């Protein structure tokens, strides 16, 4: 079995087992050798604290891509054991996130708020059809003519959109054309007509009586009075 070579310390480990490697890496000599290695590398590259930020540009990115260890840690370039070994037990959150929001009617209303309705209306609580967008004929110029929905009573799905609206329309029609009220109004109109006819007949009778009195006065003779005289033209003069 080949021995493990430490490039920082420039030595071969006597015990190349994982336990021996871990003990060497955590040792004080290895840490000091590693610090000295990077100091020498920065000195060779001419990197100082003054130009360190400028070094982090494209040159640093290219050096990172040139390093095989850093290239393996780039997004989408995970090693095979990381793709299939280390991540097989971690599922993506978005694939199962909908499970946290689906109650399926198993929990009470007080505990889960708006997620407490049954699964029958969970995915689509409001089933809107093409007829629900327009205004009904009874509300074309009404209060709710400019709104998206026809009225607040029409916001129920599953074929029950316009039950309340139809009920309101029917009630309005019943109020406008009530047979009892129509019959009462008809009776009032008939009574008024009878009263008008009877009053007209009385007026005609009164006119007839006046005509009879006038004819009788025309055919009557001269009128005589104790204090006055009548001339030939039926003119009556009264002495003062």
From Swiss-Prot:
Compositional bias of kind Polar residues: 226-240
Primary localization class, coarse: nucleus
Keywords, sorted A to Z: Metal-binding, Nucleus, Ribonucleoprotein, RNA-binding, Zinc, Zinc-finger
Pfam families: zf-U1
GO CC list: commitment complex; U1 snRNP; U2-type prespliceosome
Entry's localization field: Nucleus
Spans through the membrane: none
MF terms in GO: mRNA binding; pre-mRNA 5'-splice site binding; U1 snRNA binding; zinc ion binding
Keyword set includes Thylakoid: no
Gene3D superfamilies: Classic Zinc Finger
InterPro entries referenced in this protein's UniProt entry, alphabetically: Matrin/U1-C_Znf_C2H2, Matrin/U1-like-C_Znf_C2H2, U1-CZ_Znf_C2H2, U1_snRNP-C, Znf_C2H2_sf
Region listing for Disordered, in residue ranges: 86-122, 175-240
Assembly and oligomerization: U1 snRNP is composed of the 7 core Sm proteins B/B', D1, D2, D3, E, F and G that assemble in a heptameric protein ring on the Sm site of the small nuclear RNA to form the core snRNP, and at least 3 U1 snRNP-specific proteins U1-70K, U1-A and U1-C. U1-C interacts with U1 snRNA and the 5' splice-site region of the pre-mRNA.
Family: Belongs to the U1 small nuclear ribonucleoprotein C family.
UniProt protein name: U1 small nuclear ribonucleoprotein C
Species of provenance: Plasmodium vivax (strain Salvador I)
